[in-house]
C-alpha cells in the first residue's frame, strides 16, 4: 500500500482551524435552534442463556434504552459449541451463548427487527451471527432493506488486543469483505464493520497510536473491498459511508475531545483523498462509544461513577464530533458481573445527560477554541505520520507485530507511571484513606450466574442436533466449505446453513478446515526493558536473584498462562514484561490455552512458579483443572506455587486457595513490582517447606 504524503495537514486553513470540526460562522445557538436528537442509548448486555438475555433486553428497552448491544459468550465468539472441551467453564459467563438458529430466535423473541437498531460485539464469527440474525428477520417478515445495526467484525484489532480471532489475516479479511459486499446489496442500512479504537486504548495506545492504528485498519479493509471488484465504482462511496467506528474515551477530558475531533477530520481527509469520496455525508466519521471499562478502579469503586460521567462528556459535548451511540459500563465492573440495578444506574446517567442538561441545545461549543484546535491539530498531525509508518510496512496486516509491540510498550509505560505515582489514580495510589462504603456488600453487589446454565446449554445443543435434518445440515456444511475454497460470497451459504440447523461450532470448524487457525504475536519479547534507576525494581531484582541462588537455580522461571477462551491479554502481557524486568526467565505462550497445555508446559519447562490470568469468570472450573493436571504431570503445586490474577470475588478467591492456589491477585493489586517480590517469596517458601 502506498503511504500518504507526510507532513502537516496543509488542508487546514490557518485562520479558522481544522476542517470540518472547527469551521463555523454564526452564533453558538440561533433563536430557533431545535434541540438535537440524543445519541442511541445502549447497555452492553447478555449472559446465561438466550431466554434470560431476551428478558433482560425487554426490561432495558422498557426503561428507555433505544438500541440493543449484544454481548456474546466466549465460545460463541471463538467458534466453539458449548460441549467442546475448550468451552468448559466459559459458557454464558461474559455474554449470551448462541449455538444455533433456535438460540437466536429465543434471543430476539418479541423484538421487531425492522424497528430495532442492534449492535453485536462479534468478530471472528461475525458472519455467522449476522447470518442467523438475517434468518430470524426473514422469519419475522422484516424486509432486509430495513434492518439496522452493526456487527463489530474488526478482526485486525483482535490480533492486537482482544484476542477472539480464529483464522489467519488473509481469510479473515476475506470474511469481512464478503460481509461488506453482501451488506451493500442486501442490508444497506446495516453497518457491516465497526473499526475499533476502543480495545487499542485499553491495550495501551496513546491517542496518537489509537487514531493512527485504527485508520490504518480501516484502510486495510477498504482497500481489500476495492480489490474484490464486486462493488461498482459508482457505489463505492456508499460502501465507504457504511464503515463505522467503535471508540473509547478516557479521563483526560480535553485530550479525548480533541482526539475525537482529530478522528473526524482525518477520516474526512482520508476518504476524500484516497477513495475519491465527494459526498460529505459518506465521509462522515460515524462512531459509537463505550467509555473505558478497564480503567475503572477496584479500590473505592464508587468513584467510578464520576469517571464514567466525565468520559461520557468527552464524546457528547462536541457536536461536530459527537458519538452516534453510547454505552456506559457499570460502576463495579472491575469487581464482578454487574447486577441489572448497576446497569440501570449507568443507563440513567445517559438519560440525565441527554434529557436534563442543555448540551443538545447548542452548536459545537469548542468551535473557535485555540486550545482545542491546537490539541486536535497536534494529535492529527502525529497520527497521520504514524499511519504512514504502518502503511509503509505493507499496511495494517503487514504491521501487526509492530503495532502489537508498540501497544505493549505503551501500556508498560502507563503502568509504571501509576506505580511510581507520576500518574494519579484517586483511591488507588493517592487519597487511599476511606470510610466504609454502604455499597460494599460482597454477597449482594454482583449478579449471580446460574451454575447449571452450562449444563442446560449443552442439553439444548444436543436436543437441537437430535431434532434437525442431519443430511440437510451436512449438505449445508459442504456448501460452506466449497464457497470458502472458491470465491463465492460466504454470507448466503451461511444463512442457508443456519436454516439447515448447523451449529456455531460446526460452521467455524468447516472454515477451520479450509482456512486453518492463527496465533497472534504477544508483543512481550519486543517490549522495552526497564533499565536500572528505579529503586523498588532494583530491590526486587536483587530479591529474585537471591532466591534463585538460595534454591540452587541459575534464574527463577515463571510460566504465565491464560487458560480457557479469555482473550484479554493486557494483564498477562504486563505481568510477563514486569517479571522479565524483575529478573525472572518468563515462558509466555499467549492466549487461549487448555489446562492440559499449561500443565504440560509447566512440566516440560521446569518452572518454579505458574501465573494464571483469567478475566472471563471461568476461574472456578479452569484453575482447579490446571492444578489437577499439573499433579498428573508430576508438578506438585505445593512445590511449584500457582498464583492467579483476575476479576475474582473474595469468596471465590478463598475457594481457590483451599484448592491449592498460593495467592490470588485482583485489580486492587496494581503494583506489579511489589507483586513480583511477593511471588519470589512464595517460590522460596515453597522450596523450604517441601525440602
Indicate residue ranges for each PLM-predicted region.
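Acidic/polar, glycine-rich intrinsically disordered N-terminal extensions of enzymes
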Residues: 1-103, 107-114, 137-142, 385-391, ...
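Catalytic alpha/beta active-site cores
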Residues: 1-256, 274-277, 281-290, 322-329, ...
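Conserved, mostly hydrophobic/aromatic
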Residues: 64, 100, 141, 267, ...
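Short beta-alpha connecting loops at secondary-structure transitions
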Residues: 88-93, 118, 157-167, 200-204, ...
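Phosphate/diphosphate-binding loops
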Residues: 99, 122-125, 163-183, 264, ...
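Active-site-adjacent beta->alpha loops and helix N-cap segments on the catalytic face
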Residues: 126, 130, 594-596, 618-627, ...
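Flexible, glycine/charged-enriched surface loops at secondary-structure junctions
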Residues: 144-147, 190-192, 228-240, 271-285, ...
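Flexible glycine/proline-rich, aromatic-decorated loop/lid segments
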Residues: 236-239, 277-291, 299-332, 338-359, ...
